């Protein structure tokens, strides 16, 4: 039987920040019993033994074993002379049922029935028969639990969408939460039960509009509303595909701005070498259409790499209805990548205006469906989901839009009016939909989902603030500056509040149920631990503790002796001397003569709680002694002391501090609904080496459950600070009321423990992001170096007129003279060209070279854009929520009472990552602006156009001996203007490079050395008809992408904060390095080396790097400490090769050692092989590639395999006919087999 707990293990993306700490303690109830027997009369040891049941869960199967339950109850009976064990024994049925869980094992309803039978047999006969008013009565709880199990069984069998509603003390049971979550999972699994009204389908004016809606609905298996136009059949789907291919593929005819001969739905692939390089969303749309058409016509589906992209023209763009705004992803993708297919700007802006208005209306409908609800509402969740799904927005579509927007530089949004507003609305809607649909499958009023939903809400809030800050501040790079002045309407402010509607997922804590339970507990310690459990499960503050109405009375002779001792209470001076003599964590037994004194609470707070807590916060004690001291402060004298509001208020936050520090060091017991498999490793470790728990693994006690587990929540440090602040107020009140108030030192807390806990919390995140940023920048440098030679050659190729001989079909490419290139004179003499200044090749080879240059450039631009998007996603997922907590820590009121403030360095890390992303976007923009990016489509478009005149008309003109008609008037030569921007002609090295990397046929003539053909004119014509060789002229563009990358980096240096440069000033007269991304001292703080290698007993207060250590060699050789000669100050027009001086990887003495980490798919194979053989050792201590490294190609799977997963399978006609859809809704595969009545 599968457990109900496993059904709640999904949790969406927000679960990483809300995950409870660790796996279940091995041994369960048997281990607790064993530790309880070993505790003896030590109250702190008893507390330690029962802590797994107080804060965690154990397997429900343990309760089904009578021997385990009997041994546990007998052990409690031996300790019933103490108030805490006596209170547990009195309500043992509630105590055990509260922590019981379906757990990781195969426990089902049969085990639950057996457990209830065992507990029923353990109840005393006096309480088993009559009904009592006690809400924690065992027989009452067992009866209510049986009724809940029967209701759950009926709900699951009927499958009507009903959910389990629970109230009273049973709502605090772990397994009841799991049953409730399972009924909600069944409800969301069957959603939507009613048909969806796809209004875009009914409003569509074209076959393409109806096709897009049909593919979306059928692929995701969404039901159609009966009131609509009707669900298309398999024959309808085939007919739509045939019509789109046969009747629309060749052009719409008469479209405004339509290119001659190219106005159809499908355009040629813009890159034949990689499907990633050419508009993936548009290509996927084309694959869907052509795949169904191939099956309908009995043909074969073409290869993905040969499929054209789905395009548009002016006529079709006008016919796209705004109601289907979210179905036109291929249009937005093309516009953001500057692909207009000849459509006029006026048509594009009118289209964008309609789409922006429709998206604003959709956002308003979402807001209306969510309403003003501020807490969990299943009805509102269903309404919002219906609105989003009907409009065409689900989790998959939202993810596609998020990736598309993240991979495109923000400057690309400023070309047309309304494009910025449309992109901003798409960003807000897709971000909201991602959070919404990730929370939907596991939404339930349980503590597990409450933690997930709270983490997701806080993350969405932090992302919205970050997005608003980036939008209002504007880009700081010069290349992106125009975006701030050409923004469309509605882009200045946040277009829509995408955070508030998520409140419908926020689950309010069941405070009333816990109040009812707490009011019936007789032990103050048991009551306090109940509220600690409440705070930990629901991440909500507990109410102020109430004063117990009567002191705890203990049975037997011991109770009489304690009461007699209380009568003869010691005076104040003796009590204070007694409290001074106590040793925290070591004195086991309390003396009733002093503990029951009315002076004991104030003396214990002043002489024990204050100094002991100072020692714990100063990190002077080892982990084990710190936990023991906190346990002792909580439990010492708790069974004997008189009721005291001061001591009760002081011990409650101490219990919370103990539980939180425990889970940070070693991991506390698991919480209800948590999958143990999901918490075995730290969720923030991107490198796969979980060493963050080393601080707690050394010398960990077996009974503490030591192990390398992660944290329970994202605000653990803040919870400790809140608790310390609460204790501070109590200590201040106590000291101010004493006679020594004037002599008491000021209340100040050390910060070493906070520094250590913060280091443990974020060391993995900081180190992973630091390494990812380094690799990202190294990949950018490598890409700039490799692609700059290609863009430089393309620039030089189109900077001079190319001479074409129509009779021989040869093209003469100008080469540099001896004065321009003295180093290649010997190579020139080997050329077979008729002129030493030209290189001869045929026209088809030139076309292949032109196409290859554009393909390689676009492939590099697309891959780098994806790598930049992955880095931006990594920052948004890990760093943005961490920044929110770090800022909360820095602004916490507790720092007003500390010896020195804590300065988290996540702000500096954020600045580094932001600057790296800005440089990444600038590189993407430089690639898009290079001449090679549009080499075929614009620069050499004339080569690929149909001939302007056919042979018959040419012969007629020749026979008539007439001058050419106006159509033959040669176009004016667009030669480059003179000056610094005029590049040198193409060199022979460029020819060899293009022949080796782009088209081998270009240099085949050098190997064969054929003789130049001798041609004799057959006829001669009059001067009026003799035409000079056609000159193919182009407009020059910038050659060097590396120059743009370097110039951006150099200019960016003026905007960097001082934290990004060396702390020491430059010598007088010496120019500081222009670009310094990761200096040694600052990088040391980011890597948090002191958190990794320093003593586990003391954390550094200033987080400064150690003078010596394993990172020193890495820091000293950091590839980002560039010298002033790394980037040339020459202008871009002086040539691309000049900008390559000092670039890493050159193979000389100045080559950077970090070249070993370059991704293999960006560099050449020879370079990769050379690096692999010459650099057997790596400086990086980690060998597993980070996500950003894999995204850029390094260390990932084969390129073909990676690209194969880029596009989902198309919708086949057979699948549509049989209703077997290839894509499954999120959440359907997460459903485990539900618990049944069978007992394994």
Curated annotation (Swiss-Prot):
Biased amino acid composition, Low complexity: 1116-1127, 1182-1191
GO biological process: virion assembly
Localization in the cell: Virion tegument; Host cytoplasm; Host nucleus; Host Golgi apparatus, Host trans-Golgi network
Keywords, ordered alphabetically: Host cytoplasm, Host Golgi apparatus, Host nucleus, Virion, Virion tegument
Disulphide-bonded residues: none
Chain spans, region Disordered: 1-20, 673-709, 963-984, 1091-1240
Keyword Transferase: no
Biased composition range(s): Basic residues: 1220-1233
Record Pfam families: Herpes_U30
Any one of the GO CC terms: viral tegument
Chain intervals with Acidic residues compositional bias: 1128-1137
Positions of region (Interaction with large tegument protein): 619-1240
Family under the similarity heading: Belongs to the herpesviridae inner tegument protein family.
Role, per record: Plays an essential role in cytoplasmic secondary envelopment during viral egress. Interacts with the capsid via the large tegument protein/LTP and participates in its transport to the host trans-Golgi network (TGN) where secondary envelopment occurs. Modulates tegumentation and capsid accumulation at the viral assembly complex.
Subunit structure and binding partners: Interacts (via C-terminus) with the large tegument protein/LTP (via N-terminus).
Official protein name in the record: Inner tegument protein
Source organism: Epstein-Barr virus (strain AG876) (HHV-4)
């Amino acid at each position: 039987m599968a457990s109900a707990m496993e059904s709640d293990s999904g949790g969406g993306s927000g679960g990483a920040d809300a995950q409870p700490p660790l796996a279940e303690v091995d041994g369960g109830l048997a281990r607790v019993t064993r530790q309880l027997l070993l505790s003896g009369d030590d109250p702190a040891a008893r507390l330690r033994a029962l802590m797994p049941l107080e804060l965690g869960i154990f397997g429900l199967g343990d309760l089904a074993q009578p021997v385990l339950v009997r041994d546990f109850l007998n052990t409690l009976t031996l300790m019933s002379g103490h108030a805490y064990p006596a209170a547990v024994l009195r309500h043992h049925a509630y105590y055990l049922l509260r922590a019981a869980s379906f757990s990781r094992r195969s426990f089902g309803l049969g085990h639950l029935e057996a457990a209830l039978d065992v507990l029923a047999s353990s109840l005393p006969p006096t309480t088993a028969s009559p009904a009592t008013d006690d809400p924690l009565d065992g027989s009452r709880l067992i009866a209510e639990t049986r009724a809940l199990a029967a209701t759950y069984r009926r709900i699951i069998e009927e499958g009507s969408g009903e959910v389990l509603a629970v109230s009273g003390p049973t709502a605090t049971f772990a397994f009841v939460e799991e049953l409730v979550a399972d009924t909600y999972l069944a409800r969301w699994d069957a959603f939507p039960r009613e048909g969806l009204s796809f209004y875009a389908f009914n409003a569509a004016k074209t076959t393409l509009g109806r096709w897009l809606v049909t593919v979306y609905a059928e692929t995701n298996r969404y039901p159609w509303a009966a009131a609509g136009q009707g669900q298309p059949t398999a024959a309808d789907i085939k007919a739509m595909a045939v019509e789109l291919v046969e009747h629309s593929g060749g052009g719409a005819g008469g479209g405004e701005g339509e290119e001659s001969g190219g106005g159809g739905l499908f355009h040629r692939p813009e890159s034949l070498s990689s499907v990633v390089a050419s508009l993936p969303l548009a290509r996927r749309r084309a694959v869907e259409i052509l795949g169904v058409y191939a099956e309908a016509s009995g043909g074969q589906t073409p290869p993905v790499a040969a499929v054209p992209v789905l395009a548009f023209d002016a006529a079709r763009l006008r016919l796209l209805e705004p109601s289907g705004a979210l179905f036109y992803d291929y249009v937005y993708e093309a516009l953001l990548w500057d692909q207009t297919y000849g459509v006029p700007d006026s048509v594009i802006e009118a289209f964008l205006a309609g789409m922006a208005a429709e998206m604003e209306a959709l956002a308003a409908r979402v807001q209306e469906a969510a309403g003003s609800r501020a807490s969990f509402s299943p009805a509102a969740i269903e309404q919002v989901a219906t609105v989003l799904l009907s409009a065409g927005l689900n989790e998959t579509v939202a993810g596609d839009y998020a990736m598309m927007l993240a991979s495109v530089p923000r400057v690309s949004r400023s070309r047309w009016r309304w494009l910025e507003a449309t992109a901003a609305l798409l960003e807000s809607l897709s971000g909201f939909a991602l959070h919404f649909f990730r929370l939907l499958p596991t939404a339930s009023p349980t503590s597990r989902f409450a933690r997930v939903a709270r983490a997701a809400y806080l993350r969405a809030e932090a992302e919205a603030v970050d997005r608003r800050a980036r939008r209002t501040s504007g880009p700081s790079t010069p290349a992106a500056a125009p975006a701030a002045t050409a923004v469309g309407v509605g882009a200045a402010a946040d277009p829509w509040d995408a955070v508030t509607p998520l409140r419908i997922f926020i689950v309010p804590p069941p405070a009333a149920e816990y109040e009812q339970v707490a009011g019936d507990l007789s032990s103050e310690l048991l009551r306090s631990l109940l509220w600690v459990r409440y705070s930990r499960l629901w991440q909500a503050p507990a109410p102020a503790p109430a004063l117990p109405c009567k002191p705890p009375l203990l049975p037997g002779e011991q109770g009489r002796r304690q009461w007699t001792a209380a009568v003869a209470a010691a005076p104040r001076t003796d009590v204070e001397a007694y409290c001074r003599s106590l040793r925290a964590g070591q004195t086991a037994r309390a003396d009733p003569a002093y503990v029951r004194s009315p002076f004991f609470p104030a003396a214990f707070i002043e002489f024990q709680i204050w100094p002991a807590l100072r020692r714990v916060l100063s990190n002077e004690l080892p982990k084990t002694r710190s936990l023991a001291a906190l346990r002792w402060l909580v439990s010492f004298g708790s069974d004997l002391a008189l009721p005291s509001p001061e001591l009760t208020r002081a011990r409650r936050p101490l219990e919370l501090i103990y539980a939180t520090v425990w889970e940070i060091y070693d991991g506390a017991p698991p919480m209800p609904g948590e999958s143990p498999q999901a918490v075995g490793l730290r969720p923030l470790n991107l490198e796969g080496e979980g060493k963050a728990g080393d601080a707690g693994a050394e010398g960990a006690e077996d009974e503490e459950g030591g192990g390398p587990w992660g944290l329970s929540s994202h605000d653990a440090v803040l919870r400790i600070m809140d608790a310390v602040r609460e204790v501070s107020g109590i200590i201040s009140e106590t000291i101010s009321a004493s006679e020594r108030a004037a002599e008491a030192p000021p209340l100040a807390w050390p910060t070493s423990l906070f520094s250590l806990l913060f280091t443990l919390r974020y060391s993995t995140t900081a180190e992973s992001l630091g390494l990812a940023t380094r690799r990202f920048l190294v990949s950018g440098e490598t890409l700039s170096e490799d692609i700059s030679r290609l863009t430089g050659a393309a620039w030089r190729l189109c900077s001079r007129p190319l001479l074409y001989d129509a009779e021989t079909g040869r093209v003469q490419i100008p080469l540099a003279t001896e004065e321009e290139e003295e180093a290649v004179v010997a190579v020139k003499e080997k050329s077979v060209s008729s002129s030493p200044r030209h290189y001869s090749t045929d026209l088809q080879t030139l076309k292949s070279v032109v196409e290859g240059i554009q393909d390689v450039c676009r492939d590099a631009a697309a891959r780098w854009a994806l790598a930049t998007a992955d880095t931006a996603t990594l920052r948004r997922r890990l760093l943005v929520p961490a920044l929110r907590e770090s800022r909360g820590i820095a602004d916490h009121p507790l720092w007003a009472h500390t010896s020195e403030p804590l300065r988290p360095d996540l702000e500096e890390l954020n600045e580094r990552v932001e600057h790296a992303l800005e440089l990444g976007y600038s590189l993407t923009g430089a690639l898009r602006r290079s001449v090679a990016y549009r080499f075929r489509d614009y620069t050499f478009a004339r080569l690929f156009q149909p001939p302007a005149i056919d042979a018959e008309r040419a012969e007629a003109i020749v026979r008539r001996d007439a001058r050419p008609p106006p159509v033959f008037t040669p176009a004016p030569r667009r030669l480059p203007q003179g000056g610094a921007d005029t590049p040198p002609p193409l060199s022979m090295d460029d020819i060899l490079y293009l022949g080796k990397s782009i088209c081998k046929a270009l240099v085949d003539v050098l190997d064969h050395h054929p003789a130049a053909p001798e041609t004799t004119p057959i006829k001669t014509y009059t001067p009026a008809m003799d035409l000079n060789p056609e000159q193919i002229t182009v407009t020059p563009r910038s050659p060097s992408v590396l120059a743009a990358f370097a110039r951006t980096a150099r200019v960016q240096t003026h905007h960097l904060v001082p934290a990004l440069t060396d702390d020491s000033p430059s010598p007088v007269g010496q120019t500081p390095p222009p670009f310094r991304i990761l200096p040694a001292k600052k990088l040391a703080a980011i890597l948090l080396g002191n958190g990794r290698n320093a003593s586990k007993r003391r954390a550094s207060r200033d987080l400064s790097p150690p003078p010596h250590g394993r990172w020193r060699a890495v820091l000293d050789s950091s590839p980002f400490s560039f010298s002033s000669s790394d980037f040339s100050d020459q202008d871009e027009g002086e040539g691309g090769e000049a900008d390559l001086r000092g670039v890493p990887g050159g193979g000389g003495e100045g080559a950077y050692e970090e070249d070993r980490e370059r991704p293999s798919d960006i560099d050449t194979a020879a370079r990769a092989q050379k690096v692999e053989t010459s650099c057997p050792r790596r400086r990086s201590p980690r060998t597993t590639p980070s996500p950003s490294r894999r995204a850029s190609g390094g260390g990932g799977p084969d390129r073909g395999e990676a690209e194969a997963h880029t596009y989902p399978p198309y919708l086949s006609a057979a699948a549509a006919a049989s209703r077997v859809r290839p894509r499954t809704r999120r959440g359907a595969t997460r459903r485990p087999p539900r618990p049944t009545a069978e007992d394994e």
